Regions:
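Hydrophobic alpha-helical scaffolding
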Residues: 9, 45, 102, 109, ...
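Glycine-rich phosphate/cofactor-binding loops in nucleotide/flavin-utilizing enzymes
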Residues: 15-35, 131-203
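Catalytic-loop motifs flanking and including active-site residues across diverse enzymes
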Residues: 51, 80-83, 108, 163-169
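A glycine-rich phosphate-binding loop feature that marks nucleotide/adenosyl-phosphate handling sites
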Residues: 73-76, 109-111, 187-191
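C-terminal helix-coil-helix/basic helical segment that borders enzyme active sites and/or dimer interfaces
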Residues: 68-71, 82-140
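Acidic/polar loop patches that form or flank catalytic/metal-binding clefts of enzymes
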Residues: 6-9, 124, 179-182
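Glycine-rich beta->alpha junctions and the first turn(s) of the following alpha-helix
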Residues: 1-85, 155, 194-203
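Generic, well-ordered alpha-helical scaffold segments in large soluble proteins
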Residues: 22, 54-58, 62, 73, ...
Length: 203
């Protein structure tokens, strides 16, 4: 398929720059700092935005809101929620006024991914057996907790894995030296690859 020249995004032969910009926007969106998302937008909510009440609803539905361990878990989920909101605000303002590089979106992306995983673990613990068994066809808080736990890795992959975010933070935000790589500054077409396995003799 051939496209006309006016369909090119960015400069010809400079697609990597466009791809990096796209990934940066994706990281910002997944991290909760973009107004152009359909999911939760911590930036728009502000410091006093709506709280995540799913953990509280769970303990109340199971009648364990007086349990000391359950209350500690609910408090942990609340702290993660408040910390994320403050982090998104600070990083977004920093990128806007130039005090932080645009790649700083990796900070909110990484925190969002790790805190989301932890909050799904908390909801699973609070739901107990309700997270693995429920009346057929019914949408319950326990079912939601169980299904969210099974999907918990999604946020760690969208916009780049946690390991990639740590590399971005280290190299492009903190200015630390890059890891050594044998193929650095080598055109992709010249990067050495593993040889294709040969078929066994007589196959």
């Amino acid at each position: 398929m051939r496209l006309p020249p006016d369909s090119v995004v960015g400069d010809v032969n400079d697609g990597w720059t466009v791809a990096l910009a796209l990934l940066g926007h994706e990281r910002n969106a997944v991290g909760g700092g973009s107004p152009y998302v359909s999911g939760r937008n911590y930036l728009a909510e502000g410091a006093d935005g709506a709280r995540d009440l799913s953990s509280i609803a769970l303990v109340r539905s199971r009648g364990i809101d007086g349990d000391a361990v359950a209350r500690q878990l609910v408090a942990e989920a609340h702290v993660l929620d408040v910390a994320q909101r403050g982090l998104v605000q600070r990083v977004t303002v920093g990128m806007g006024n130039g005090k932080l590089a645009g790649q700083a979106a990796a900070i909110t992306k990484l925190f969002t991914a790790t805190s989301a995983e932890r909050k799904t673990e908390i909801r699973l613990a609070l739901a107990g057996t309700d997270a693995v068994t429920w009346p057929a066809g019914e949408e319950t808080l326990g079912r939601e907790a169980g299904e969210s736990f099974l999907e918990r890795q999604a946020t760690s992959l969208a916009g780049g894995s946690n390991e990639i975010q740590r590399n971005i933070i280290a190299e492009r935000v903190l200015g630390m030296p890059r890891e050594w790589a044998a193929d650095r500054d080598v055109p992709f077409r010249d990067v050495r690859r593993n040889a294709m396995p040969t078929a066994p003799s007589g196959a």
